[in-house]
Amino acid sequence: MEYRKFGNTIIARIDKGEEILEQVKEIALKENIKLASIQALGAINDFTAGVFKTDEKKYYSNHFTGSFEIVSLTGTINTMDGEFYSHLHMSAGNDKGEVFGGHLNQAIVSAT
């Protein structure tokens, strides 16, 4: 991963094989970021996204592998109980035009 700061903005390139949430956390801790918004695009080949079913009060995760383009990745960095916390949602599409997404649990970059 490589990143640069431009005032209050950070632009990052996460390398092939790296996990997105781990890299976001690394930057946030290194730069002492306590509050931020995030947006991203790129290609991934392995990701897990979840959905909270409010009527059941239960969380469900779905795991996907294959070639995907990130359609949207957006969210926030903040703190919870004084510790780093990120809340990101992602949608990713495959070569058939199918799009899957939800609360991002993990995603591996496949191309930069």
Residue map of PLM features:
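N-terminal intrinsically disordered, cationic/polar leader segments
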Residues: 1-87, 91-112
